[in-house]
Every structure is written in C-alpha cells, then in structure tokens.
Amino acid sequence: MWSNCIFLTLFTFYLFLGQSCCQTDTLLQGQYLKDGQELVSAFNIFKLKFFNFENSSNWYLGIWYNNFYLSGAVWIANRNNPVLGRSGSLTVDSLGRLRILRGASSLLELSSTETTGNTTLKLLDSGNLQLQEMDSDGSMKRTLWQSFDYPTDTLLPGMKLGFNVKTGKRWELTSWLGDTLPASGSFVFGMDDNITNRLTILWLGNVYWASGLWFKGGFSLEKLNTNGFIFSFVSTESEHYFMYSGDENYGGPLFPRIRIDQQGSLQKINLDGVKKHVHCSPSVFGEELEYGCYQQNFRNCVPARYKEVTGSWDCSPFGFGYTYTRKTYDLSYCSRFGYTFRETVSPSAENGFVFNEIGRRLSSYDCYVKCLQNCSCVAYASTNGDGTGCEIWNTDPTNENSASHHPRTIYIRIKGSKLAATWLVVVASLFLIIPVTWLIIYLVLRKFKIKGTNFVSESLKMISSQSCSLTNKRLSTLRVGSTIDQEMLLLELGIERRRRGKRSARNNNNELQIFSFESVAFATDYFSDANKLGEGGFGPVYKGRLIDGEEVAIKRLSLASGQGLVEFKNEAMLIAKLQHTNLVKLLGCCVEKDEKMLIYEYMPNKSLDYFLFDPLRKIVLDWKLRFRIMEGIIQGLLYLHKYSRLKVIHRDIKAGNILLDEDMNPKISDFGMARIFGAQESKANTKRVAGTFGYMSPEYFREGLFSAKSDVFSFGVLMLEIICGRKNNSFHHDSEGPLNLIVHVWNLFKENRVREVIDPSLGDSAVENPQVLRCVQVALLCVQQNADDRPSMLDVVSMIYGDGNNALSLPKEPAFYDGPPRSSPEMEVEPPEMENVSANRVTITVMEAR
C-alpha cells in the first residue's frame, strides 16, 4: 500500500514536471506524425510514437506510458504490418480516413470511414486513441474510430473483452509471437463463444485456460488473482463483454493493466511496473510465485499435464485442480516426467520435419509443445530468423562439422533430474495413504455411531496439509470441491466421488450424483429470479436445466434457514435408498463450501395444492383424476410402510408435498422429517414436534408419538381435502362453524348428509357416485382419534376398491372433535407451519433438528 502511494506521488510529480508547451494530444486533419514526433495525452500519461526494437529495421506505431519506468507498448497499430525503416508516418487525410504511410504510399488504413466534416485524432488520458468528427464550435460530434476497439496484447481499464452480437466485432487480446516480435501470436484472451459469462485463453484455437463462471460479481475460479481489478459484466441485446476499472488501493483508475505474454500467462502490471500473475497457467515444475503459480524458463521444464478436456490445471506442481470440459490433447506419456531441453548453437546435419501452418506463424513456445507431444522428437528449432516457425527432429541434428547449414539455436531434449519421478512416487504414496486413512476413520465412526469430532477434523486437516492435492474425481461437467468437511459429509451420506456416466447408466444407479456449485449455478442461470419456483423453510427452490438438457428442480439450503445439516442428510440418504414410481426422484446433491443443495427430477405440473385449492384450476381435477391421485399416494405410502427395504414414516403428508408429473401422476416428496423404523419397531417418540398444522395426528401433536398410523391420519385429512376441494384448516375464521374440515364432514356424516361436502366442481355425477361416498367413509376411518382404530395403508387399499357387498365399519369420533389440540407441558412444540398454496415444484417444510 505504501509503495503504491510513493509511486503514485512520484508519477504525478513527473507528469506535471514533464509538461511542455510544445507537446500536443491532437493530430489535425492533413497533419503528419513522423518518426521522432509524439502525441502526448493532456496529463502526460500516455504517448503515441513510432518505435523499433534493437537490431531491427521494422518500425511500429504504438501507445506507451509516458514515464521512465513503465516500459512496453500497450497498443500497436501495425503489429502485423511493420514499416521498413524510418519512412513511416501517420495522417488523417482529406476524407477523414486514418492511415499509416510508408513514404508516400499507404501501408495500412486504420479507419476507412469517409466524412466531409472536420476530423481530428486525439490521444486521451485513458490510453484510448480516438478519431473524432468535430462540430463547428469545436466540440466532438461523434467518434469515428478508436484504438480501444482494436486491442493488441494489453488490456487497460475501460477496455472491453467480449463481442458485438450484431456486427460480429470481437474485443480480445492476442499475444506477441516473440519478445521483439509483436505480430499476432498463438494465445487469444477473450470471452468464451459458448459460455458468455466466462473468459478463456485459447492456444491455437483450443481452450488453454478458463476463468470460471461469472457469479455475484466475481469469477468462480478461486485462485484467480483479481486484486486491483474491479470487474463488471455487461450483457445486452447487441453486446456481451467484461470490463474492469482500477482499485484505488492498487494505483488508482489507470492501473493495473493486464497483458497476455507469449506463453499464455496473464500478467498484472502495477503502477510500480512490477509484473504479477493474474492466473495460474497449466502447472509446471518451477519456482513458486504469488497465488501458488509456478513459472520458469519454459524450455527447462515439462508441464505435468497439458490438457483441455476434463483437463485439470491449477496452482500446484501436480496438475490437479480446476476442471472444465473441452476437446483434449494430452501430452505424450513420455513427456510428462523427467525431460528437459538444453539450448545449443550448432549447424544441423540434416533437415527435420517442418510444420507448415497455413495462415499462422508458430512461436518458439508452440514449437516446444509440438515436440513434447511427439515421443519421437529429440530436438526442435525455429525456422525463421525472427524466432518463428517450427522444425523438429527424431535424431540428434547437431553437427559441429556440418558445412551445409548455418549455425542456429537448437533445443535438445535430454533426460533431466529425478525430481519429477520422485514427486510421482510421493504423490502416488499420498493417494494411497489418504483414502485408506479416511476409510479407517469412517469405519470407526460408523462402529461407534459418532458423527465427527474435533480430533478427527484436525487429524484430517493435518493429513491434508501434508499432501499438496487430493484426488480429483471429475464428473464430466460436474465437480465438487474437496475440502475435509465436504468429504466427511459425503462419506456419511455413503456417496463416493465418481464420474457421471452415460445417461442410461445413471438412471440405473440408485446412488446420488454429485453436482458442483458452478454447474448448478449455470443450470439455474445463476439462481435468477426468473427460475425461482418458491421458497420455504429449507430455502429457495429453482428450476434448472443441466448441460444435457434435462430439467431439474433444485432446493438450496438458505444460510438463514432454521433447518440444517441433519435434515439435509436425512432427505439425501432416504430418497437415495427409496425407488418407487410414486416417490419423487432425487438425482443428486451439491456439497461445496457453505452450499448444500438437493437436485430433483422436475415436476412440470407443480404440486397438488396448486390445483386443488384454486377455484379455476381445480376444474382440471375431475373425479377420475382425483381418485387416480389418491391411488398413487396410497401406493407410495404402502411402499414406505411395508414393501421398501426400509420401513419409513414420512410424518409430513399434505397436498403441498404431493408433486404431479407431466401426466398428473402423484409423487410424494419432502423427506426431511421422515424416520426409519426397525423391523420390529412400530412407534417412536420425539420431544421436538414440528409439522404442518391440520395434518398432524393428535398423539404426535400432544405427546410426540408417531407411527405408521400418523401417516394414515395425514392421508385421511388429504383424502377429505381431495374430495371436498377445501383445506382442513379453512374453517378456523368461522367462530360459529366447525373447527376444521374433519369435524365438518363428521357432523354431516352423522346426519347422513355427506353428499353436501363433495366439491361442487365435480358435478352432480360425483354426488351420486358410490365410490366417492365410500372414499369419504374411508377418510373418516383414517382420522379417528385413537391410532389403534385407524386402518393400515394395506387395509386402505382393500377398502377403497371394495363395493357395496364389502361393508365398511362405521368410523368413531375423529381427532380434535373435542376442541383445539393442547400440548403436554413436557413437550417442546415448534410453531406449526400454516398451509399455503404452493407455487413450488418441490415443496419445503419447516423442520427442527431432532
């Protein structure tokens, strides 16, 4: 911070001290800027001039910082069309065109727009060179052309990285071919064509590095050094682009600048001229720099991995880390370890294989990688005097006595030190030790039914600190960060990290898939409000579309939620082990950092309450469909209670937890409160009661007792709601009427007036339908006060399919007939959730840890 302040003070002092009465920032129409002349911006920050490199006759027109310690051109007008000798000049001709001349001949036309107005060229203090059409009063009328629209290898604050949808114009950086050769090189830094909210570096047209997705004002790649940058993302109908401004703590609005070098690395160049890395390139064995980056002369090392599909690059010397999917081009296995290159100057005894890249010149770095990709390659060299072109040999080409070739720099491949092989042994050992250690700890935890201790956590963290990387199991486009807490949670869930196989394979696999936060964010358009389906005690629910086109519903645990890890694990473990056509399918989960999400199959018709309690939408539910929905719920509950490998009590059956697929088939959802019973266990007790008002059985509400008969009670309430088209608690505003729907139906049943409770939208035919009347009686049997009097779900099946010859027993007094429920003084009763019409395709219940 103090160093930046000192440099900023000196820089400002230099600007004002160096001002001259003779300098100008403007080139008028008809004037010429020649070698030895400069345009200097108003506050002496930037200058435009012709320049050349030492021992080169090629001259370039470029913009530089106008001070003694910030070297290097930030923009070059004619990078691919140098002027031979000192004959170059820049002018705005009589037609308003901006042209670079070689002598009297036109070399390069920067702006071809013709205008009859007064036109001037001005260098701004932002570093932008603008061709402006002026009004008669001297004010600017419009910008005809600007250098910011044609970046070279450097990005300044205010410049764009992206593209114009309508014109196809792209704003991107392109590396130099060499240190003294500014022609367009092999690396391009810009916006991804397919995923517009991320930046990529392309090498020879292939993805070399990616920034991660833009989300909540930042990039998802953690080890991206954005200190000093304030990035913004703009997306309109015509343009998509990134832009950044400078942070005041890092040099103010003009700094830092970003440059892509010849090896594909992004450099941050601060006010003091010091270069630091913005990102970590594909890992190499080398010296550790800021943010864990490794770099040294590339010819003296071999990348541990050079990939771009499921390619794993990061900031460690082992090559495991950030993952994304693109076409792959691995290095040959022989090149991964134990080789270096020795530089020698010698004639070549014979000609090698010369790469002829049409329309492109290969840099020395490109040639180096071409050699690495070929196990037969033992040497490489540039074919041109400027360091471009590529020639490789499969035998040693050096021959000091050869007279047929001139001496040139050749890089000979030799076996290097045993460092890489040593690291391979170390890494392999760690990969063996870490899983074994985790397995032992997991078995101990399971044996003693311990969910985790500080000792275990600290031990695992210590083990992790001794290793440089954890095994990076990738799921094609899905990935989870491998922190200790996440791994322990996944172990508890019984989930192993693995590749996401083909779709058919996944459908046959009952285990959960693991999704990365990045993939879920991308699927939901970064949790946009447009994809939000609803919100409840668990948190918001979003609709998403996976990369393979599958639609999903995503429950995202809110940090402010009263629910927590217990409910998350409960639902994830239960649904993963339960498979039935009338149970909602859980596809996977996301456990990354503080994020916990559940990913379900998407239910396009939302939930039952969405239709049932709306006066217009309920018309869709005729009696045939309502009965089919009840059948499906019965089959789902029967499976949970009797036929699944686990005996499960749901404890929160209600209309909002019945989801409807595209064919209106019901699926039971929300297993956060569910409990598993042993084979010989019939009931259980809890001291913390939570649920939905109107659906809880009296023994559960008053005493905390629950069993399969608790679900039967809830189902009975739901049956009455389906038949009557009203909520159970819809009577509570009527002080003189019945307490709830149960009491209302019971009173009319005793008076033989049960037809009056049937939903009028079902029509007259339903009123006389004996099946409807039978279902009313079955529902009353399910909501009886005494749990022992209620039928089992297996009994319910036989009851609803019976006919007049199979008489039903008369129901006894229903629950809560004697007044509102009162809890026991020993019970801790949480405020019940009031039932609302749900807009969710996945529902949420307020729950408390048990």
Curated annotation (Swiss-Prot):
Quote the tissue specificity entry: Mostly expressed in leaves, and, to a lower extent, in roots and flowers.
Q: Which residues cross the membrane?
A: 424-444
InterPro entries per record: Bulb-type_lectin_dom, Bulb-type_lectin_dom_sf, Kinase-like_dom_sf, Pan_app, Prot_kinase_dom, Ser-Thr/Tyr_kinase_cat_dom, Ser/Thr_kinase_AS, SRK-like_kinase
A Pfam family of the record is: B_lectin
User: What are the catalytic residues?
Assistant: D652 (proton acceptor)
Superkingdom of origin: Eukaryota
Task: List the stretches on the Extracellular face of the membrane.
Answer: 23-423
Segments in the Cytoplasmic topological domain: 445-850
Q: Which CDD domains match?
A: B_lectin, PAN_AP_plant, STKc_IRAK
Reactions this protein catalyses? L-seryl-[protein] + ATP = O-phospho-L-seryl-[protein] + ADP + H(+); L-threonyl-[protein] + ATP = O-phospho-L-threonyl-[protein] + ADP + H(+)
Give the protein's recorded name.
G-type lectin S-receptor-like serine/threonine-protein kinase CES101
- How is this protein positioned relative to the membrane? Single-pass type I membrane protein
In the record, Phosphoserine modifications are located at S561, S669, S730, S838
Tell me its EC number(s), please: 2.7.11.1
Q: Which UniProt keywords apply?
A: ATP-binding, Cell membrane, Disulfide bond, Glycoprotein, Kinase, Lectin, Membrane, Nucleotide-binding, Phosphoprotein, Receptor, Serine/threonine-protein kinase, Signal, Transferase, Transmembrane, Transmembrane helix
SUPFAM superfamilies named among the record's database cross-references: alpha-D-mannose-specific plant lectins, Protein kinase-like (PK-like)
**Start and end of every Bulb-type lectin domain?**
24-144
Q: Where in the cell is it found?
A: Cell membrane
